[in-house]
Amino acid sequence: MRLSRFFMPILKENPKEAEIVSHRLMLRTGMIRQQSAGIYTWLPLGKRVLDKVNAVIREEQNRSGAIELLMPTLQSAELWQESGRYDAYGKEMLRIKDRQDRPMLYGPTNEEMITDIFRSYVKSYRNLPLNLYHIQLKFRDEIRPRFGTMRSREFLMKDAYSFDLDRAGAEHAYKRMFAAYLRTFDRLGLRAIPMRADTGPIGGNLSHEFIILADTGESEVFCHKDFLGFDIPGEDTNFDDVASMNAIFEKWTSRYAATSEMHEEAAFDAIPEGERLSARGIEVGHIFYFGTKYSEAMGAKVLGPDGKEHTVHMGSYGIGPTRLVPAIIEASHDDNGIIWPKGIAPFDIVVINMKTGDDACDTACGRLYSDLGKAGFDVLLDDTDERAGGKFATADIIGVPVQVIVGPRSIANGEVEVKDRKTGARETMTVEAAINKLVAAR
Amino acid sequence: MRLSRFFMPILKENPKEAEIVSHRLMLRTGMIRQQSAGIYTWLPLGKRVLDKVNAVIREEQNRSGAIELLMPTLQSAELWQESGRYDAYGKEMLRIKDRQDRPMLYGPTNEEMITDIFRSYVKSYRNLPLNLYHIQLKFRDEIRPRFGTMRSREFLMKDAYSFDLDRAGAEHAYKRMFAAYLRTFDRLGLRAIPMRADTGPIGGNLSHEFIILADTGESEVFCHKDFLGFDIPGEDTNFDDVASMNAIFEKWTSRYAATSEMHEEAAFDAIPEGERLSARGIEVGHIFYFGTKYSEAMGAKVLGPDGKEHTVHMGSYGIGPTRLVPAIIEASHDDNGIIWPKGIAPFDIVVINMKTGDDACDTACGRLYSDLGKAGFDVLLDDTDERAGGKFATADIIGVPVQVIVGPRSIANGEVEVKDRKTGARETMTVEAAINKLVAAR
């Protein structure tokens, strides 16, 4: 993408309304724009990051055996009356009447709808296990939306729903998703710690929140330091294998970790003092096993191998992509701006033309842009008329991992500078060497 | 994808509520499920097609120079009061009040919001031309939703919005999108004819509907037969070049074509009788140039090269992906089911194991599945326990372009059958020859 043809409205000033660094940087870099309280547009730069985060989530959901569909945003009130949550959900549910005066709602979550889909098609244990997910907008009418897309009203959620014949099957499903979440957050550059958590309005028997540590987190969390070093399940993980799933789950639940709602002072105090971690955290995922809560109320049953009807056991598993993006920024930035982890950055490489209009600079930039693009990189070429200082500041604040700087003096020797955004390390080399180095490091 | 692990609930019976073939086939094959009147879930098979259609739309939008963002579904009523459309829009607009009693609405389109975004960031002609698009859910509270996702209430729309300094610039933007639409529909296997059209509630001076001919179409259309043979702009089309855009536009508007609202009997009668086409059509795209209608009302101005303020000229450009999917089916099916054009099919190839559990069949299927997958194909392997006849019917109805049939008798000679879904042509060859043939034809 040539910056002269892109739409990336960088703000010169820090927006006053931003209380936390991710919100400030997302507004400054033109990633998002608030349309109404808690309702945001994802501008082109932000949309690129959001797409890449979604792609990672999707890959790991698919790897674990979950299947993607797409449920609508609007739901009929009837479904929620069946489960009993229509009245229970309170003011966070956005209730709507259509032109025929039928009561509807903007889905805050989809347990009811997916259970309705399940019961209408699946009649036999032979079709189990089943895990269906979608990445779809939700609306929760928060009384105090804040921190940009960290706590917004209209937000994107990946929500998966598992169906199993019995509790043992459902626990395997839960552990599959547990392992998939560990992989997902790791690929997003985050160390997320699964913590025992309250089940809230979803309900159920077993629940973990995945929390990343950050000073701006809304939750107070307590855990063992060992979590910082635990291994992440590899790409070759066999999610079908019960023993593997058990081993991962046991490892990652072998140490104390709890949010304040579930905190047990005595258990935490039993940890040697130097190994305790008491910090603030951001919830980036939440998984639930709730047995037959919805399947019972809504009649989701299958014939078992014994020829009898069984009410299915369910779980649900959420990740909020529109919250993950600011969470990643909270975890990865410096005074100059965002530092995107590889694979999530809006562009892989930014080529900075220090003197647009200079023949040698333009030619070298054109070659870098074209060759790196052909090699499969997402390249941003800063071909605008801005002065070099402004271009450097822009490249830093938007956090593209690698900068290739093309200036008139060095290009006279056929050389460019390659800068690593994270470490600040710079290296001077020929255009060809730069291309070869970047392609080799892919 | 192994069918035994996929979720594809094929219905045995034709659903009674379906009046047109696409609706019937989408329900039969488990592509969609109705949740409420005019509100659908896209089940996994349908979601795969929808994703591929969106990918084609996105590629062609990007190629033409448009930039993707993502606006929210809910909008504040205030914005629409500014443009004057809040009262004008009528009952199709879903009006909502949030917990603070603020009037909001589920966006039926985004002219107001994009104009608001534009005016808050763009102040100079130097940032023009600009075309911003998103692919986002819309809601229109149709009095009579019908034909499945062909006319639903919650639907997906790709809507692009162009901003230019003057009318000449806006006409170039209009013609860019005109050419992009020709390419898009062609890649989706459709012959879409641009027809002069009424501008409806969007308003404006110039408008074309892109119509495909189909007996089940809701519009009556009239055009010259020459449209069926016109060339589609190539991949190397230079969208920046005004002369190229003019040439394409002139060619494709050189013959009579109008919907019934804009029909002129006399002009149509002037066409020699054998060259007239009077038929029913499905609208698959609609483009508008409406000058300063919204920019004037909402104060979207830029400084021109003359140092003076200019109210920008705008256009908007819509395609409905959730309507395109059934439109493609209307245009491409036979008595046995859907016939997907290449590139849009939910899977590229289906490997049918006629006797799951038979060692030779299982081994050959495993190899085909693995090798074709590695070659980059989306492969569905029917490894279920169903009888062969049922598997053939399923492969036909879901419309995957190529079937590779592995049966115990032919595999004893090391052979499989390759069937073309569209022509019905079958060829027997070795497993290796089948793989080579399919990879070579990619």
From Swiss-Prot, chains A, B:
Any GO MF annotation of the entry: ATP binding
GO biological process, one term: prolyl-tRNA aminoacylation
Gene Ontology CC, one term: cytosol
Known EC number: 6.1.1.15
Catalytic activity: tRNA(Pro) + L-proline + ATP = L-prolyl-tRNA(Pro) + AMP + diphosphate
Gene3D superfamilies, per database record: Anticodon-binding domain, Bira Bifunctional Protein, Domain 2
Pfam families hit by this protein: HGTP_anticodon, tRNA-synt_2b
Keywords: Aminoacyl-tRNA synthetase, ATP-binding, Cytoplasm, Ligase, Nucleotide-binding, Protein biosynthesis
Catalytic EC class: ligase
Subcellular location: Cytoplasm
Main location per the UniProt record: cytoplasm
Family: Belongs to the class-II aminoacyl-tRNA synthetase family. ProS type 2 subfamily.
The protein's role, per its UniProt record: Catalyzes the attachment of proline to tRNA(Pro) in a two-step reaction: proline is first activated by ATP to form Pro-AMP and then transferred to the acceptor end of tRNA(Pro).
NCBIfam families (UniProt xref): PRK12325.1, proS_fam_II
Assembly behavior: Homodimer.
Stated name of the protein: Proline--tRNA ligase
Taxon lineage: Bacteria, Pseudomonadati, Pseudomonadota, Alphaproteobacteria, Hyphomicrobiales
